[in-house]
Amino acid sequence: MFQNNPLLAQLKQQIEANKEYVEGTVKASDKAFGFLECDKKSYFIPPMEMKKVMHGDKVKAVVKREDDKEQVEIDSLLEPMLDRFIAQVRFNKDNKLQLIVDHPSIKNIIPANTHKKVTETLESGDWVVAQLKTHPLRDDRFLFAQVTQFICKADDNFAPWWVTLARHEQPREPVANEKSYELHDELDREDLTSLYFTTIDSPSTQDMDDALYIEPIKQGEVQTGWRLVVAIADPTAYIPENSNLEKAARQRCFTNYLPGFNIPMLPRELSDDLCSLVPNKKRPALVGYIETDLAGNITGDTRFVSAWVESKAKLAYDNVSDYLEQVENAWQPESAETKQQIDWLHQFTLARIEWRRNNALLFKESGDYSFELNEDGSVRDIHVEYRRIANQMIEESMIIANICCAKFLADNAKTGVFNTHAGFDPKNLELAQKFLLDTLSTDENRDALTAFYAPEKLATLEGYCEMRRSIDEFPEKFLELRLRRYLTFAEFKSEVAPHLGLGISHYATWTSPIRKYGDMVNHRLIKQVLLGKQAKTVEEGILVRLQEARRQNRLVERDIADWLYARYLFPMVEQAVEFDCEIADVSRGGVRAKVIANGAQIFVPFSTLHDKKEEMEFRPEEIALYIKGEKAYQIGQAVKVKLTEVRLETRSIVGNII
């Protein structure tokens, strides 16, 4: 009767046309209901509709209104939250396999089976990789997954490492050693083994890729400058282009430095032995001769040579720093030659620091946090380490070497792996200017500062450096921390471009080829120039992979650290330990505070800061929270936080500001 009825079809079209569709992301709550987060609005998702979705799903939904209430009815799936995911195993009362997703907001328990390639017998709590196979909105079936990889047992103390590496699809083993390694030299090697090269590194370092020799340049008896000879390990001499080792290095891109151990980019036989500039061993190297005047200005062109070198001493950062800082009972150089090298390199470093202060930008000292681990992977202690003078000596030598490499490649190869940074994201230039003016200007200087911080000026190397130097003495941290949010990301490029973060017009690293694939590429380009060959333009695919690998490695480091911090602080909850902190972020949900002593991040919910929500206002442009119209908390602010809760299953650390 109703089949092919034009009136009915018209009615259906009218009903469909009158529906209000929205698209957004599902946000689960601690209860059975949830919310659909759209661009400018949030909609209530009732419990029955939440059964069709999970936290993070991107969906299309229909808005339903009843009286003055709005909610949505899920229509279709746009993109599932899960595809490949990490989970822990559990078994229900019928001994059926289920998966608990390793995500703080996903509460769904997902039934699963096991792929035939997984041969381990799974037990409750084991960590696995799984693939979502069916979704209620997409497949008209309940959620279902398949275990595709076993990671580790539930009681494995090194689960933070293995689970995190699996999550980011990173290898946990070094590249396998080859049966043998042969030198493939096209360039004649100069014998520089008589030069008194030294290395300065951490005592535990095995993969030493830089050694230094320095001497004064004199005209008669008068010193006019410095000659720095930078010897860098030469792994490309052992690794033919397009070999399996080259392909493995290209995929990994970096040595992964994790708490407790590293996963090298190259086989350990190369990284820790044949290529490492160990003391009293003859090693192949790519060497750069750099000359400066006494003020640290680079004079003339850098000369690169292929060479044999021999490090005469392996020195430790803290020992050298203690000696130069004249710490009581400090270590002393074991020979007159070592002492001379340290003293000369120290003088050169002071000149280069001053040069960069006036002509580029210096790093702000913030300290690095390192985990001291027991053999079983538990955290014994966490240390904060600051860059001392010996660290700066190596840092300044590597920076000038990389500046010279970039100029050499730009002039001769017309390509390279260049490290670049454009400063402020173009879309944030006017916002950055407004923030600077709102923070720093007065009625008297507003016109002058408006011109000084003009967007078109902030976009240039010179203007950006002038801006950074102008705020160096500003007493509160929030200014610099807020400006960081307006910056764009550093990028690898095949054409030379400025690095505004360093305040330098050209920069290309070549000083860590054992640890960085981009440095290996630059070594090959330098050698092509020295051989008189036409340098091949660096492929875009290499730059993309470098960018991706750098991001992955940072996420791995962060995720492992979050897990170790949770383990470390968990026993302190009962003692209600209090920490001196600095506010690292303010968001709509609360405040995130960094513990000064160990670097842990503690979340402080807004609900604990003030009991009247209507009197609280979050201002994202300032990264600040206002209470009753007064600024109460802002990024960079010093606060004291009491630890109240650590949730090991989600690695979340919670506290109260006191």
From Swiss-Prot:
Pfam family, one: RNB
Gene Ontology cellular component terms for the protein in this record: cytosol
EC numbers on record: 3.1.13.1
The keyword Cell cycle appears for this protein: no
The RNB domain, residue ranges: 189-530
GO MF annotation list: exoribonuclease II activity; RNA binding
Subcellular location: Cytoplasm
Reaction(s) catalysed (UniProt annotation): Exonucleolytic cleavage in the 3'- to 5'-direction to yield nucleoside 5'-phosphates
Keywords, alphabetical: Cytoplasm, Exonuclease, Hydrolase, Nuclease, RNA-binding
Alphabetical list of InterPro entries matching this protein: CSD (IPR011129), NA-bd_OB-fold (IPR012340), RNase_B_OB_dom (IPR013223), RNase_II (IPR011804), RNase_II/R (IPR001900), RNase_II/RNase_R (IPR004476), RNR_Ribonuclease (IPR050180), S1_domain (IPR003029)
GO BP terms in the entry: mRNA catabolic process
Domain S1 motif: 576-658
Cell cycle in keyword set: no
NCBIfam families assigned to the protein according to its UniProt record, in alphabetical order: 3_prime_RNase, PRK05054.1, RNase_B
Function: Involved in mRNA degradation. Hydrolyzes single-stranded polyribonucleotides processively in the 3' to 5' direction.
Family: Belongs to the RNR ribonuclease family. RNase II subfamily.
The name this protein goes by in its record: Exoribonuclease 2
Organismal lineage: Bacteria, Pseudomonadati, Pseudomonadota, Gammaproteobacteria, Pasteurellales
Gene this protein is translated from: rnb
